[in-house]
Design a protein with these regions (language model features):
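Short alpha-helical transmembrane segments in multi-pass integral membrane proteins
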Residues: 1-14, 72-139, 181-241, 294-359, ...
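Transmembrane helical elements of multi-pass membrane transporters/channels
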Residues: 12-31, 133, 144, 167, ...
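Transmembrane alpha-helix boundary and packing residues in multipass membrane permease domains
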Residues: 17, 21, 33, 70, ...
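Helix-terminus/linker motif at the lipid-water interface of multi-pass membrane proteins
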Residues: 26-45, 114-121, 177-184, 245-278, ...
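Small-residue-rich hydrophobic transmembrane alpha-helices
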Residues: 44-104, 141-160, 268-330, 364-377, ...
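Short runs within selected transmembrane alpha-helices of multi-pass transporters and secretion channels
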Residues: 62-65, 133-152, 160-171, 189-204, ...
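Membrane-water interface regions at transmembrane-helix termini and the short interhelical loops
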Residues: 147-155, 175-187
Length: 437
């Protein structure tokens, strides 16, 4: 594949993912807007806390999408049609097992969440109501991890984009109807999410049987349960799960340390982190492209194209990070004012503008290497680099720097965490990615 053609392939895979990612905060904004016009501010808190529960829970299971993408892309590169199909079958089996686990443990999860979360009795009561309804979307959400991972591995990110847009549009419409027209409050928002997720799952199934039917093969138990394939599948996904848990815990640790600095500083940090997430929406698009292409060329045993893909991904990553850095550096107050109109927030955030500007160039390498490692199914390496970065760098740096430098110390520790992730994956790439297969 020529360089120009490879660039087109990267953009063809990246752009739909970026569009999909951009629709995510829109949904959250609409939910907050609907709750913000109810007769109590407790509704807003309930949506925020309820969303946190599901974000943590589903982030732990996000390994299913990553593992499915890597295995499927490698089978695609090797032109192994049977293994392409069985990558989906095995992932759906894991999704069903995870569904049984989540639904069986919903009582203990709700109890533990209510104990750990801080809020008034009214907020926690609404949060519990929201949780009890939205939990029934779990089967659809977990199966969609499998389907979206499979479609990306099959070098198609347009279908996941369509699924994401349709799901979010249906969710927004139903939430407006249930809340404004039917007066269902948080129950309406949660119910809209449940129905929308099943609409997304139905769409994924329709695409499977209309666009990819010729890739499907009859399910044979002996192949589905093949010992060596199953062992590798579980081993890789277990390592990806550990990595996901460590990442979720790292973000939660940052948030918890922010809360120790007081409500005002917590608000400042949560606003600044929104711009970390916004940048990640763009770089994750290229990371997903990396998953698909790196997996494909790994499966095809084509080291030349593999190296060229990684090189081009990082060029794109740099050219995405550069304008974000300039914009964050030149217009920090304007960006912050988009999120909050509280008069004290903008001046309080000014000492931390430097960290906002530093986010893009410091973090893009870690995001892109994630995609490369996932495509190569270098799960053990990505687990180890996350362990080194989270436990060996972020935790001690925070404990060392925060007592002396306060919020500056926390942000320095967080950026060191991201540097450690990017640097450790760079150092391990020769063995983990380029010489792995």
């Amino acid at each position: 594949m020529r360089k120009e053609s490879l660039n087109r392939s990267i953009l063809k895979l990246a752009i739909p993912n970026i569009i999909s990612n951009i629709t995510v905060p829109l949904l959250g904004f609409v939910d907050m807007m609907l709750m913000g016009h109810q007769d109590s501010v407790a509704y807003i808190g309930a949506i925020g806390l309820g969303g946190t529960i599901f974000s943590v829970m589903y982030s732990i299971f996000s390994f299913m999408r990553a593992g499915t993408t890597g295995f499927t892309a490698q089978a695609y590169g090797a032109n192994d049609r049977a293994e392409m199909a069985y990558s989906l079958y095995r992932s759906l089996c894991i999704a069903l097992i995870a569904t049984v686990l989540v639904l069986s443990l919903q009582g203990p999860v709700e109890w533990l969440s209510m104990k750990l979360l801080h809020g008034s009795e009214e907020v926690l009561a609404y949060t519990a109501t929201y949780f009890r309804v939205r939990i029934w979307a779990a089967p659809a959400v977990l199966c969609l991890y499998a389907f979206n991972g499979w479609y990306i591995g099959m070098q198609n990110t347009t279908i996941p984009m369509i699924i994401a847009i349709l799901t979010n549009v249906v969710n927004i419409i139903l939430s407006i109807i249930f809340v404004n027209a039917m007066g269902m409050g948080v129950t309406g928002v949660a119910l809209g999410t449940v129905i929308a997720q099943y609409c997304g799952l139905l769409t994924a199934i329709v695409f499977l049987f209309t666009k990819f039917r010729h890739y499907l093969v009859p399910i044979r138990r002996v192949l589905l349960m093949q010992a060596d394939k199953l062992k590798r599948f579980f081993k890789v996904n277990a390592d990806f799960m550990i990595r996901s848990i460590l990442l979720v815990l790292s973000i939660a640790f940052f948030n918890n340390q922010s809360a120790k600095l007081g409500d005002d500083m917590l608000a400042v940090n949560m606003i600044l982190m929104q711009f970390f997430y916004i940048f990640s929406y763009f770089t994750d698009g290229f990371a997903y492209a990396g998953e698909a292409l790196v997996g494909r060329f790994t499966g095809a045993h084509d080291p030349k194209q593999l190296r060229q893909t990684v090189k081009l991904l990082f060029l794109w990553g740099f050219f995405i990070a550069l304008p974000f850095t300039v914009l964050y550096a030149l217009f920090p107050d304007w960006f912050i004012s988009l999120v909050s109109d509280q008069p004290g927030i903008i001046p309080m955030a000014q000492p931390y503008h430097i960290y906002l500007a530093a986010i893009p160039l410091i973090t893009f390498a870690a995001f892109l290497w994630d995609g490369v490692y996932i495509g190569a199914t270098a799960a053990r390496a990505i687990r180890n680099t996350m362990l080194i970065s989270a436990v060996g760098v972020f935790l001690p740096a925070t404990l060392l720097l925060m007592p002396r430098f306060g919020n500056h110390g926390l942000w320095i520790a967080f950026l060191l965490f991201m540097v450690a992730r990017g640097l450790s994956m760079t150092l391990m790439a020769k063995k983990a990615v380029f010489s792995a297969k």
